[in-house]
A protein has these predicted regions:
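Alpha-helical membrane-inserting segments
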Residues: 5, 47-51, 55, 68, ...
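Structural signature of hydrophobic alpha-helical transmembrane segments
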Residues: 9-17, 51-69
């Protein structure tokens, strides 16, 4: 059915749930800021794609993918903890570079727009 096919991909978007918790509950944390959310997700997913293409789907590649993602986020000052799961999802499911753009970049952008509107409604300064 259409519903079961749609639910089959839900696990690929799990990090977004944790991102939502940050932007709604601790919106003033540096880890929840738009730059961190968007670039953290993009850079970590890209790290997963790179490691997958270099090493395939192995236990070592899973660890290296997460390590690379954390390193890149730290070096770019874009740490966003939920994004740390992206390399695992990318490697386990064998995603290509297109995954970085859709659903990752588009989804992260939508979360930022939602966070802005939600926090504005509550009269809180998100951006």
């Amino acid at each position: 059915s259409r519903v079961s096919r749609g639910l089959g991909d839900v696990y690929k978007r799990q990090p977004f749930g944790a991102s939502m918790v940050l932007v709604m509950a601790v919106y003033d944390s540096p880890l929840a800021k738009p730059k961190n959310l968007i670039l953290g997700h993009i850079l970590s997913a890209l790290s997963g794609v790179i490691i997958f293409y270099l090493l395939g789907n192995t236990f070592i590649s899973l660890g290296l993918g997460v390590a690379l993602a954390v390193f890149v986020m730290m070096m770019t000052n874009t740490v966003h903890p939920p994004a740390g799961a992206n390399p695992i999802i990318v490697i386990l499911t064998g995603q290509s570079i297109s995954f970085v753009f859709l659903p990752v970049a588009v989804g992260a952008f939508i979360i930022v727009v939602f966070a802005y509107l939600y926090n504005r409604l509550l009269k809180r300064n998100y951006i």
